[in-house]
């Protein structure tokens, strides 16, 4: 620790901190464009200049100078830094004037307007005149693909996008060429970006040079209602903000959550909102003479009642269902003496104790891991944000091993093999220097445990974990899976045979399976997907942004999602549909609202009470 004085405020900070970080500890605002706490230091925008008393005669870039480099005063007094002196004020005005020399006056038509760092800092630290009389520089826009829109005349060369794609996303397709006035950000050889994290450069760009192509010219930020909630496109449970205008979702942005997604989200999460408007089920349908026709809720519920009474019933829980809706379905099917299952990906995960399906590691363990073993998973595709964590560990010196098909994971790894023999080899090998006395995490993909011998493979992995003192992280691919297993939504025998032998299958949003001809299928879901095409009766429900609910992510973290907008047409919340159906069946579920449902849920599974808000 070292004592320094910033603007006459004395404080003790870690000597490894930069001056900018020390200013943040002292709650002193220092403007910046190129600096970002999750990227390497570039020091090229010069907006964060401060005065070091007794130091260099010129202002110093606070993002690049560490506290340990400060010299004490002539009499041994603590080093002194000024952020509001006349020297600093003039330096910032000069830097801002240079930044605006070639910047176009696009603010009225720029998508970044209203949330632009350049606008805010020009108002706070700039001047109200320009001495530049020459023609502004013109640059050609880049084609980075269908997701990221470019307006390169607005670029201020902060290089955040270059550093993110190189350091976090792990691709080398962007860089800076030229010097001085000829410097420009470009993609090498005119390539489009090949990353499922590329949308994050839109958030990182401090100006309007990189914007969202699907969102372009659709709304202004002050027109949008902002709701903090949880992503369900994978099992990580990333914290997100859903921005809505009226009844429509306009965009999805990440929220900083160090323990889960840091401040990144995958492109699937970011751009899925356009699918919330298409192929929506907005009214009940029933099948007559092989064709679906529009129906009404009373007619649909009566038909469901007639089919559910007296027949064998089996319930399926899809990937996006909340814990409350699965709990309500379970209670209803128990009343009907039926069965149910949530492991529709075929994962051989025992339900005996929570560690068997929720693992023993948390996502943050990857940050400190010195050895990571990936078994039967491609995290780059299955959970891109988690893959970025593994890459960060690799960049910090962690050793990575892979058992499974080799692929480009954006980091180096030792390919041990791709079958069960490779696991046996790992179990029999002596604890070498790669693992011995090191923090180790085993990432287990569903691909490793969804075959016939899945239980045996999982047992083998557990033996490897025990012998190497490793933690296990199960790479679930469905947001609903851990929560459903928490409440016991599993079948003891072969659920595929149970579905075939059922008279009625109640499908709660499961679009990832094919149900063979035979049973009467009731599909409760939000989109006209595979499940709706097979259904004999469709009950339209809300999507994940249209209802509040609990989700449990792959590490077992209980999270609370909030409703951002309302469902279209006659679609209802999932739990409310099941409650209404139970009333028709004279097997009334004991709750009339979501609060009462949660009280019943927490009464049986009290660990779900401690939900973490996004």
Put a short name on every predicted segment:
Residues 40-44, 49-56:
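Short acidic beta-strand-loop surface patches of small beta-rich interaction domains
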Residues 1-16, 21-24, 32, 36, ...:
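N-terminal export/assembly segments and adjacent metallocofactor-ligating motifs
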Residues 340, 344-612:
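Non-catalytic alpha/beta scaffold blocks inside enzyme catalytic domains
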Residues 63-72:
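Structured interaction patches on ligand/partner-binding surfaces of diverse proteins
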Residues 35-44, 66, 179:
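Short, glycine-/polar-rich solvent-exposed loops and beta-turns at beta-strand/coil boundaries
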Residues 5, 48, 63:
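Acidic, glycine-enriched active-site microenvironments
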């Amino acid at each position: 620790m070292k004592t320094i004085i910033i603007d006459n405020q004395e404080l003790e900070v870690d000597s490894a901190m930069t001056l900018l970080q020390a200013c943040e500890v002292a709650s002193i605002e220092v403007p910046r464009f190129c600096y970002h706490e999750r990227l390497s230091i570039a020091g090229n925008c010069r907006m964060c200049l401060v005065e070091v008393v007794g130091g260099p005669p010129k202002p110093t870039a606070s993002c690049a100078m560490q506290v340990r480099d400060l010299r004490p005063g002539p009499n041994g007094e603590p080093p002194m830094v000024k952020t509001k002196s006349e020297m600093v004020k003039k330096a910032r005005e000069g830097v801002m004037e240079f930044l605006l020399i070639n910047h176009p006056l696009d603010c009225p038509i720029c998508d970044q307007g209203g949330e632009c760092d350049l606008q805010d800092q020009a108002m706070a630290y700039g001047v109200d005149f320009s001495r530049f009389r020459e023609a502004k520089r013109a640059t050609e826009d880049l084609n980075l693909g269908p997701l990221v829109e470019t307006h390169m005349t607005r670029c201020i060369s902060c290089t955040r996008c270059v550093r993110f794609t190189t350091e976090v996303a792990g691709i080398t397709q962007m860089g800076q060429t030229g010097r001085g006035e000829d410097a420009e950000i470009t993609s090498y050889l005119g390539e489009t970006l090949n990353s499922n994290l590329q949308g994050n450069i839109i958030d990182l760009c401090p100006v309007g040079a990189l914007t969202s192509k699907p969102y372009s010219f659709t709304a202004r930020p002050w027109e949008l209602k902002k709701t903090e909630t949880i992503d369900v496109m994978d099992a990580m449970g990333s914290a997100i903000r859903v921005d809505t205008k009226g009844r429509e979702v306009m965009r999805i942005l990440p929220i900083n959550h160090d323990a889960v997604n840091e401040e990144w989200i995958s492109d699937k999460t970011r751009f899925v909102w356009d699918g919330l408007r298409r192929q929506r089920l907005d009214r009940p349908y029933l099948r007559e003479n092989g064709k679906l026709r529009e129906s009404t809720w009373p007619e649909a519920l009566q038909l469901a009642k007639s089919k559910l009474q007296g027949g064998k019933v089996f319930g399926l829980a899809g990937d996006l269902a909340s814990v409350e809706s699965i709990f309500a379905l379970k209670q209803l099917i128990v009343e009907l003496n039926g069965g149910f299952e949530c492991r529709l990906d075929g994962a051989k995960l025992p339900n005996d104790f929570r560690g068997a399906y929720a693992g023993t590691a948390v996502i943050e363990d990857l940050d400190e891991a010195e050895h990571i073993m990936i078994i039967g998973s491609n995290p780059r595709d299955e959970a891109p944000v988690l893959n970025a964590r593994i890459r960060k560990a690799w960049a910090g010196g962690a050793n990575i091993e892979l058992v499974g098909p080799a692929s480009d994971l954006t980091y180096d790894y030792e390919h041990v093999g791709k079958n069960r023999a490779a696991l046996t080899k790992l179990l029999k090998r002596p604890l070498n220097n790669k693992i011995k006395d090191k923090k180790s995490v085993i990432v287990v993909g569903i691909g490793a445990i969804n075959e016939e011998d899945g239980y045996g493979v999982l047992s083998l992995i557990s033996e490897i974990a025990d012998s190497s003192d490793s933690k296990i992280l199960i790479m679930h691919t469905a947001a609903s899976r851990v929560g459903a297993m928490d409440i016991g939504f599993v079948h003891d025998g072969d659920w595929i045979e149970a579905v075939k032998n059922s008279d009625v299958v109640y499908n709660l949003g499961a679009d990832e399976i094919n149900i063979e001809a035979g049973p009467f299928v009731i599909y409760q879901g939000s989109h006209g997907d595979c499940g709706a095409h097979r259904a004999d009766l469709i009950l339209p429900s809300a999507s994940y942004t249209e209802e509040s609910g609990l989700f449990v992510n792959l590490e077992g973290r209980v999270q609370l999602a909030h409703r951002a907008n309302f469902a279209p047409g006659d679609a209802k919340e999932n739990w409310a549909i099941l409650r209404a159906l139970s009333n028709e069946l004279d097997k009334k579920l004991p709750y009339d609202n979501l609060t009462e449902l949660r009280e019943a849920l927490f009464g049986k599974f009290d660990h779900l009470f401690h939900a973490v808000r996004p």
